[in-house]
């Protein structure tokens, strides 16, 4: 057995790491979390305005998934049928990670047209 195939056979991704990247790497999730981290609680309409490239249908799906994963929660106010979304403690813990991603992207990602 060669050194390369032995190394490949010995390597195994951590299931928790895989799940984390499955959540954070899903299109729009990072942007949704970034808006909530940067600007706090948001109504659905606020998120629609701040992430205009994401369709309403997909945004609803992502919000439900992030809620199921424990990163955000939907809070309903007594006097209003519509609620707002906010980060849970778990979601708030991403602040440092997102700051590091910002630093990395400033250093390595070239600005391109938004088209």
Describe these PLM feature segments.
Residues 2-5, 14, 86-115:
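Amphipathic alpha-helical dimerization/coiled-coil segments
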Residues 7-9:
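Disulfide-bonded cysteine motifs in exported proteins
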Residues 11, 15-58, 78-86:
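N-terminal helix-turn-helix DNA-binding core of bacterial DNA-binding proteins
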Residues 34, 67, 102:
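A cross-family signal for key residues in well-ordered alpha-helices
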Residues 59, 63-66:
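Basic amphipathic alpha-helical segments that dock to polyanions
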Residues 67-77:
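A short, conserved structural fragment
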């Amino acid at each position: 057995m060669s050194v390369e195939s032995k190394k490949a056979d010995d390597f195994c991704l951590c299931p928790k790491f895989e799940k984390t990247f499955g959540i954070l790497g899903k299109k729009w999730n990072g942007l949704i979390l970034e808006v909530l981290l940067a600007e706090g609680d948001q109504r659905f309409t606020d998120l629609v305005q701040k992430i205009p490239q994401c369709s309403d249908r997909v945004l609803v799906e992502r919000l439900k998934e992030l809620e199921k994963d424990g990163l955000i929660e939907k809070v309903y106010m007594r006097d209003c049928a519509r609620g707002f979304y906010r980060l849970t403690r778990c979601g708030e813990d991403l602040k440092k990670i997102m700051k590091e991603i910002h630093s990395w992207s400033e250093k390595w990602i070239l600005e391109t047209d938004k088209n």
